[in-house]
């Protein structure tokens, strides 16, 4: 019997939510949100990050001023232990999710590589 792919996806969602890195991420995020200075700095970083992404998606040039502002925010973030822990944990979780994505995409990769060899 074939498994319903959506059921498998929900199982994966549950596994991610139960993952230790995800639990640590939630705790780290709560710690950032509970500290006014960390929260404001994190919000500033997210706003800057989204603004730069939007510019790139629209084909706009990232100016030297944009780069300088980004570097200044990143330098301040590196001084905040709560945000640093949050970002390190998020990075570890992103590696896991990237690995899962590679596994999920393997059948398509095999299909297309077999087509190219034919």
Curated annotation (Swiss-Prot):
Pfam families (UniProt xref): Com_YlbF
Gene3D superfamilies in alphabetical order: YheA/YmcA-like
Matches recorded under NCBIfam families: PRK13676.1-4 (NF010211)
Family indicated by similarity: Belongs to the UPF0342 family.
Full protein name: UPF0342 protein BCE_0953
